[in-house]
Swiss-Prot record:
The gene is mqo. Pathway: Carbohydrate metabolism; tricarboxylic acid cycle; oxaloacetate from (S)-malate (quinone route): step 1/1. This is Probable malate:quinone oxidoreductase. GO terms for cellular component: cytoplasm. PANTHER family: L-2-HYDROXYGLUTARATE DEHYDROGENASE, MITOCHONDRIAL (PTHR43104:SF2).
């Protein structure tokens, strides 16, 4: 006998948690069930050690604003990401202010920086600063080529550096470090207190549509072969990170045809030595190597995890065919179907430089990888650093009318035409834009309910519907309010 519920959220990460809280705030009478394959929430991509945790706000990530062919830098994409991050930040602040999260310990003030180390990159960074400085959301950004000034911002990165090497840096004091694992756990604890049912160690075996439009999920207990649970729901969200593609394919919806996935793993060096970690307080992004994918931009990060400061450097791109860190090596081959084979072949052929880059990364020894860290931290001691494997990222491959198939970086909502099922595919900027992504998904899936949500959404997100960059006075008010509530 199937257990009936209004909403099923598959995946115990930041996306399901965010959507769950939004739905509970806007539709408190709806019954919600959250399913997670592992023994707890936030153990895959939302875990603090499996994501960059930058609070992506485009302050330091150079790949969001490349130099155009005309020599001009367009800040539009960076502004869009910054606006989205501020929507998330407002939502988190409201939940803290209303006592719905335990505290604000999931977010910390950590400056964001960009550091480049050759003349061409220094010239680019100056142009980027000039383009960004005129924008409200980036107005406090600083730029310098002065070695002493840069040393004040990031002393470890300048100590021992060649005096003749050109350097330039952007610095944004208002950057943050977000522990999405802690935030997810707090959100799910709140949901459990509101009656949301959580089912852990549950693997989705099958997804079927019934004649009345309901979705039926057959799940198995990963610890007990006899522990079957069947759920029947009128709305299904597939937010299982890299695992969402496999679930989307199981659903059989026509909108999911032609989608494929390309998994990329990431390695990082981690330093938990307090003496070193306390000397660096910034997230510092560099410029990506030629041919490197966007998720491989090198960065030396301050990370605050469970109240302790660490340093992380990476990522080093790798390849494993599983879609989740704790997934199966058969994930990629089993995801290849007749409807996505051609798009995947076309995308693979068009991205041979990326393939060569990944092969080169895979061949690197630990010593060769550490040499990259020395470019950013010249006096780094190998004994202080351990190499860890972060989470899997599954980049989207989709049909394209001209090219046959394209590899797409970013996130994408794939929903059934009637709004009864939605999946979130892709990766960066990911978690930092969870709130606007889930609000957009809700409007797409429940257009008839959206008008009744407007008032509460404006309470949850005080600047809802407003572009902060285009409303300077309102931006000052909202940014000051969220900074006070979140203690950043």
């Amino acid at each position: 006998m199937a257990e009936a519920t209004d909403v099923v959220l598959v995946g115990g990460g930041i996306m399901s948690a965010t959507l769950g809280v939004l739905l509970k705030e806007l539709e408190p009478s709806w019954e919600i069930t959250l399913i997670e394959r592992l023994e707890d929430v936030a153990l895959e991509s939302s875990n603090a050690w499996n994501n960059a945790g930058t609070g992506h706000s485009a302050l330091c990530e150079l790949n969001y604003a490349p130099l155009g062919a005309n020599g001009i830098i367009d800040p539009a994409r960076a502004l869009n990401i910054a606006e989205q991050f501020h929507v998330s930040r407002q939502f988190w602040a409201t939940l803290v202010a209303e006592g719905k999260l335990e505290d604000n310990s999931f977010i910390n003030a950590v400056p964001h920086m960009s550091l480049v180390m050759n003349e061409d990159h220094c010239s680019y960074l100056q142009k980027r600063y000039d383009a960004f400085k005129t924008q409200k959301l980036f107005e406090n950004m600083e730029f310098s080529t002065d070695r002493n000034k840069i040393s004040d911002w990031a002393p470890l990165m300048m100590r021992g550096r060649d005096e003749n090497q050109p350097v330039a840096a952007n610095y944004s004091a208002e950057g943050t470090d977000v522990d999405f694992g802690r935030l997810t756990r707090q959100m799910v604890k709140y949901l459990q207190g509101k009656g949301v049912k959580t089912e852990f160690n549950r693997h989705v075996e099958d997804i079927k549509r019934e004649s009345d439009g309901a979705w039926v999920l057959k799940t198995a207990d990963t610890r007990n072969p006899d522990g079957q649970l069947t759920l029947r729901t009128r709305f299904l969200f597939l937010g299982a990170g890299g695992g969402a593609l496999t679930l989307l394919q199981k659903s059989g919806i026509p909108e999911g045809k032609g989608y494929g996935g390309f998994p990329v793993s990431g390695l990082f060096f981690r330093n938990s030595n307090p003496e070193t970690a306390e000397q660096h307080n910034a997230k510092v992004y560099g410029q990506a190597s030629v041919g490197a994918p966007p998720m491989s931009v090198p960065h030396l990060d301050t990370r605050n995890v469970d109240g302790k400061r660490h340093l992380m450097f990476g990522p080093y791109a790798g390849f494993r065919s599983n879609f989740l860190k704790q997934g199966s090596l058969m994930d990629l081959p089993l995801s290849i179907h007749m409807d996505n084979l051609y798009p995947m072949l076309c995308a693979g052929w068009a991205n041979m430089p990326l393939t060569k880059y990944l092969l080169g990364e895979l061949r690197k020894t630990k010593e060769e990888r550490f040499a990259s860290l020395l470019e950013y931290y010249p006096e780094a001691n190998p004994d202080d650093w351990e190499l860890i494997t972060a989470g899997q990222r599954v980049q989207i491959i989709k049909k394209d009318s001209e090219k046959g198939g394209v590899l797409q970086f970013g996130t994408e909502i794939v929903a059934h035409a009637d709004g009864s099922l939605a999946a979130l595919l892709g990766a960066s900027p990911g978690a930092s834009t969870a709130v606007p992504l889930m609000i957009r998904l809700m409007h797409q899936c429940f257009p008839e309910r959206a008008p009744s949500w407007e008032d509460r959404l404006k309470e949850l997100v005080p600047g809802y519907g407003i572009k902060l960059n285009e409303n300077p006075e309102r931006a000052d008010e909202i940014i000051a309010y969220t900074a006070k509530v979140l203690d950043i």
